[in-house]
């Protein structure tokens, strides 16, 4: 059978006592994949490869994928490849008369790929390693096919492996404009892009599945970095496909698959890997098995990773109490190439962790138990009285089907479905206080976030006179459901509190259902590509009435209305990129979009006796207009032969209107002059607006011996008023990160099969606060912080004499400098951490 693999997909996982539950359905997926492959391969007929000696080709420069399709069509040969192999890659084109082998070589020059002949045609594989050591660097741009890809930052598998991150947030923290917020504790991280850090402001997508978790003083991302092969970051509201919300941007993550692990001449393999981090004495144990059929009809992967660490050490030598990391993750993945035009991808992933920890993962120290409690309960039990035992499970399942006949450029149809679920169960010991935890989910709580998404889209390529079109049309359905329940034993005999079992009034349950349609056309004329597009969203929020009558009062004066609210609206976008010269590309985007309130914002309540008791069903949508302009400089053979330098500069401005925010402080305009506010007042309201603007510079340099990168980001943001007073003075936005620069400088030593280098992180002080414009707004402020610089080292060794062996070492905070990241809210940074790993492929 011959194949042209247009689309591939996603993942699987598990852990500990529940590992069997995770592996079971995933194994059934892989068994199905193998059986289906056998059926289709038995039905297929081999087609002899036809290769002309020499022929004329005229393939323009641009995206690598259509260029390869054009070459294969012209030569009348079958070419097998996956979208992951060519994503974000371009070609200089091909003009003239060539033999087929030379044509492939020229078209693939610089891509790291080569065309390998098979019995039925050709298969795209990783190019054979060169004599010199090649160290991929942080990608400045994902591609230059349109303005969105030109503004996208990308981390590839080499970047991820070099950092050896404990979590996704610390991995992305080195990209300009992207910051980690929260604490180093497991599960204590969230992400901030361009000064926007709420869950609804940063979309996270893992193998096509929306991810998100919002719980008081908890992190929002729990993904194991060891399982990732690629991370794309779209900054700002400029990608129409990213859905309602995501004003800060979208982070799209892809997990590894068999094609990433296998060498060109292999159809089966495995991996064993061990890593150790000295700071928390953490061991990381990983293993994988992967393979593909002889002719590439199917591939599959099973990957396991287990973290087992102790308490994290601060620079001063003390440790974060109860910060140990105990997480296990499984990934399983299979691609079926049903025909030469169809691909089916099945994937599943599961991660689990449990252990004693503070309720608020985003915190530094914990107040130690009193000596009286230690004497009464013993040291360990006294500590556990102020902790929770947290059991967390995170699962992802997805399936994707793609139909893309080469002879029909108008048809490239993709249908995908994804299911994501994150659960947390917290329980305090029976001897913990019965009266202290109403505001922190009681003595036991159950929280579940479930996302389901179905997407259908088609991409058509055609020409109209001198114009080339890439027309994308799609529809999407997304349902987000959150369930919450807590047990508060102090009210176990009270009917108004439903005898202790009820939803936290500050964390309501409910559903958000979004139906969307989007249309986008990338129109190219020579070196200019203009991309107009529009998206329509229909969003319905429905609250779940609280079980406790205290927070579900039938009296209209309480304002406890959990009924549905619907929002609709359009989101237009216009982007352009102009390849002015072979070394300079200019790009720009203008977008106007909106977001509906999330469940918390719409349905949070307080008791009827409060001054703001009601739900917030009268909220307007929050709107944003984003403008981005930038330039990409790309040079080759600049200092030495075959070196390269790439620089991207970006200026942006986001103007928000009707910001959805808590109603606190000055509750209404009449209250400013001593008047009375109408009742009932809602918990949330719309503030006038805000402006966030900034500049970014990203660059990298690579040569035979030296490589390096530099990234710089400066952002400022102001509200039109105070967060506590919509009629007050302008105030700084608290979540704006300080000016930051990241640098990497490395040296390759080919004769040793090694590379080593230095990293530097330079952070300015952050001395802007909402309290500067309104002293009473200090409750919304973050503590001001001093500037600091951190230095690190890294090295890698891949001996050619030991096939498949690799050793890495990285040192973070080399000089053990004491520092407090601004978005960490006074939480200390991590002390010196020496991280090393050894792996063997077989």
Task: For each feature predicted by the language model, list its residue ranges.
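Gram-negative outer-membrane beta-barrel transporters
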Residues: 458, 524-530, 539, 639-656, ...
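Short loop/turn motifs that connect adjacent beta-strands in outer-membrane beta-barrel proteins
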Residues: 242-243, 258-268, 294-297, 341, ...
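Surface-exposed extracellular loop regions of Gram-negative outer-membrane beta-barrel proteins
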Residues: 352-354, 360-367, 494-495, 540-553, ...
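Membrane-embedded beta-barrel scaffold of Gram-negative outer-membrane proteins
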Residues: 274, 296, 300-304, 412-430, ...
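Acidic, small-polar-rich N-terminal luminal/periplasmic segments of exported/outer-membrane proteins
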Residues: 68, 72-88, 92-96, 104, ...
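Transmembrane beta-strands of outer-membrane beta-barrel pores
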Residues: 255, 274-280, 295, 306-310, ...
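Face-selective signature of the C-terminal outer-membrane beta-barrel domain
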Residues: 343, 349, 390-550, 639, ...
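Periplasmic-side early beta-strands and strand-to-turn transitions of outer-membrane beta-barrels
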Residues: 259, 270, 288-386, 765
């Amino acid at each position: 059978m011959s194949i042209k693999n247009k689309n591939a997909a996603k993942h699987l996982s598990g852990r500990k006592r529940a590992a069997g539950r995770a592996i079971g359905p995933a194994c059934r997926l892989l068994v199905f994949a193998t059986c289906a492959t056998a059926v289709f391969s038995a039905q297929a007929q081999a087609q002899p490869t036809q290769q002309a000696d020499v022929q004329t080709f005229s393939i323009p420069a641009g995206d690598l994928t259509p260029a390869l399709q054009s070459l294969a069509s012209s030569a009348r040969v079958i070419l097998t490849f996956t979208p992951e192999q060519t994503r974000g890659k371009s070609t200089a084109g091909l003009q003239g008369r060539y033999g087929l082998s030379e044509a492939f070589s020229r078209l693939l020059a610089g891509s790291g790929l080569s065309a390998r002949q098979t019995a039925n045609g050709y298969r795209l594989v990783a190019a054979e390693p060169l004599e010199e050591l090649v160290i991929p660097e942080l990608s400045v741009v994902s591609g230059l096919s349109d303005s969105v890809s030109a503004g996208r930052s990308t981390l590839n598998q080499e970047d991820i492996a070099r950092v050896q991150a404990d979590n996704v947030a610390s991995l992305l923290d080195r990209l300009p404009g992207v910051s980690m917020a929260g604490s180093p504790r497991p599960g204590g991280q969230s992400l901030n892009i361009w000064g926007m850090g709420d869950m609804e402001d940063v979309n996270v997508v893992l193998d096509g599945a929306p991810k998100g978790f919002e719980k008081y003083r908890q992190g929002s991302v729990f993904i194991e970095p060891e399982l990732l092969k690629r991370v794309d970051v779209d900054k700002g509201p400029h990608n129409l496909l990213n859905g309602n919300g995501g004003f800060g941007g979208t982070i799209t993550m892809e997990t590894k698959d068999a094609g990433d692990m296998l060498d060109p001449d292999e159809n089966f393999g495995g991996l064993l890997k061990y890593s150790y981090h000295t700071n928390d004495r953490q061991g990381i144990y990983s293993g994988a098995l992967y393979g593909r059929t002889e002719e590439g009809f199917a591939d599959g992967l099973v990957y396991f990773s287990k973290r087992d660490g102790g308490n994290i050490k601060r620079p001063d030598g003390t440790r974060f109490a109860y910060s140990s990391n105990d997480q296990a993750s499984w990934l399983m993945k299979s691609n079926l190439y049903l025909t030469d035009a169809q691909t089916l991808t099945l994937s599943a992933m599961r991660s689990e962790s449990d252990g004693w920890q503070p309720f608020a993962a985003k915190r530094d120290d914990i107040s130690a138990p009193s000596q009286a409690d230690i004497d009464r309960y013993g040291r360990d039990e006294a500590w556990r009285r102020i902790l929770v035992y947290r059991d967390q499970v995170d699962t992802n399942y997805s399936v994707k089907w793609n139909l893309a006949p080469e002879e029909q450029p108008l048809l490239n149809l993709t249908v995908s479905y994804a299911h994501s679920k994150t659960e947390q169960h917290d329980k305090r010991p029976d001897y913990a206080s019965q009266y202290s935890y109403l505001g922190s989910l009681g003595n036991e709580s159950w929280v579940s976030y479930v996302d389901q998404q179905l997407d259908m889209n088609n991409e058509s390529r055609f020409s109209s006179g001198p114009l080339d079109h890439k027309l994308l049309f799609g529809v999407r359905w997304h349902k987000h459901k959150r369930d919450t329940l807590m047990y508060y034993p102090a009210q176990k005999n009270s009917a108004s509190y439903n005898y202790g079992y009820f939803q936290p009034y500050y964390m309501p349950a409910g559903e958000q259902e979004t139906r969307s349609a989007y249309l986008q056309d990338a129109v190219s004329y020579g070196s200019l590509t203009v991309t107009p597009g529009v998206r329509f969203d229909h969003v319905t929020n429905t609250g779940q009435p609280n079980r406790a009558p205290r927070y579900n009062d039938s009296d209209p004066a309480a304002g406890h209305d959990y009924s549905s609210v619907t929002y609709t609206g359009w989101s237009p976008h216009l982007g352009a990129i102009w390849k002015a010269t072979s070394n300079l590309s200019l790009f720009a985007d203008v977008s106007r979009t909106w977001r509906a309130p999330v469940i918390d914002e719409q349905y949070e309540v307080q008791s009827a006796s409060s001054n703001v008791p009601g739900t917030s069903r009268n909220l307007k949508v929050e709107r944003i207009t984003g403008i981005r302009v930038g330039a990409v400089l790309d040079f080759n053979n600049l200092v030495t032969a075959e070196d390269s330098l790439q620089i991207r500069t970006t200026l942006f401005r986001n103007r928000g209107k009707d910001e959805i925010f808590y109603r606190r402080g000055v509750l209404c305009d009449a209250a400013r002059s001593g008047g009375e506010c109408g009742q009932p007042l809602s918990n949330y309201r719309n503030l006038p607006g805000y402006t966030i603007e900034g500049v970014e510079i990203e660059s990298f340099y690579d040569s035979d011996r030296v490589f390096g990168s530099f990234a710089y980001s400066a952002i400022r943001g102001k509200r039109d008023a105070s967060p506590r007073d919509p009629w007050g003075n302008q105030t700084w936005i608290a979540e704006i990160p300080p000016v930051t620069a990241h640098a990497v400088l490395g040296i390759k030593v080919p004769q040793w099969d090694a590379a080593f280098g230095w990293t530097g992180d330079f952070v300015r002080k952050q001395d802007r606060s909402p309290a500067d414009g309104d002293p009473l707004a200090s409750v919304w402020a973050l503590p001001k912080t001093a500037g600091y610089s951190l230095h690190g080292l890294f090295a890698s060794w891949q001996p050619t004499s030991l096939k498949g062996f690799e050793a890495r070492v990285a040192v973070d905070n080399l000089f053990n400098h004491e520092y407090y990241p601004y978005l960490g809210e006074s939480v200390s940074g991590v002390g010196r951490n020496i991280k090393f790993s050894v792996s063997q492929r077989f």
